[in-house]
Every structure is written in C-alpha cells, then in structure tokens.
Amino acid sequence: MKKLAIGIDIGGINTAFGLVDEQGEVYAESVISTRKYPFVEDYPSYVADLSEALHTLCNELQFEYELVGIGIGA
C-alpha cells in the first residue's frame, strides 16, 4: 500500500495543499483562498473549509493508500 503524507502551505493569499509520497512525488494538489478568512473569528470556518477540501482531494485518488503524516508551513 502506498504511504502518503499531506503537505499544507498557509500563505497570506492562498493555502496550498497536496498529497505526496516518501520520494516527494505529488499525487494530488489544490488550493483554497486564505484571504477569505481575514479575522480570527473566521478561523473555525477556515479549518472546516480546509478539512472539506482535503477530504475531497483524498477521495479523488483511485488507489489504496495510507496517510502517514502531515506537514504544515506558514
């Protein structure tokens, strides 16, 4: 079974994220707007939208895999 990790890069304009293997090959990637959530009160909505986007991305893969880690950069 392929082992994949989630990578997330939180930027001031967009949050980019993807699924990569141990060799760094990217299997899927996407972005959501970070600017859509300018206030601390928007944080729960940001996390919910990011979580939904990650679930969608993971469901697009057409093979079995194991999530073994997550990395977040900001």
Regions found by a protein language model. Give the residues of each.
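Short, Lys/Arg-enriched, disordered terminal segments
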Residues: 1-4, 60
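Short glycine-rich, Thr/Ser-proximal phosphate-binding strand/loop in the N-terminal lobe
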Residues: 4-46, 65
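Short amphipathic alpha-helical surface micro-motifs
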Residues: 13-15, 53-54, 68-70
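Short, well-ordered amphipathic alpha-helical segments that serve as non-catalytic structural scaffolds
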Residues: 45-60
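Short beta-strand-loop/turn "lid" adjacent to the catalytic site in phosphate-handling enzymes
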Residues: 60-74
